[in-house]
């Protein structure tokens, strides 16, 4: 039986996506490797580490720590990644089996099949605090990523989830926050209708999130 090629997240910790990106050092030709996991439903960073090497062993250890931290140990979870060596390593695949995680991989020759992780890395590398000259040490890189992750999860108002933070959506706080925001906008429109040319912004909570939904069209 052919395994499914698209998955839908109705709540947090159902579908994760992950990738590895290079972080430059101040030494020419030397890089650090950022492993990072994002929850598709909430956009929360659910796991991350920075290492000096790229390996399936480091990835497997990160996955175990992440599911323990998020409290989804042995619960059904899909983990999407591209087709890199670390992502398809036997060590990682064995760990995913142990953790009851279903592996999903990008289609060959499709560049945007891991779009959520790619978008996260673009945000990371274009924030004003990004050290364009590189990181001096591994500890410097880890410290910077720690600060970025706290900002991204708890302060960054994400356009893809109605401008709440990933942490708020992950904890289920977005419904109340968006209802309050909708009420505020409607009151403002009622008080000054001349300032509004149409309906207020849609503040309904973002619904389910589907991984690569265009695949469904191809299968139809």
Q: Model segments located where?
A:
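Charged DNA-binding/catalytic regions of mobile-element recombinases
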Residues: 1-220
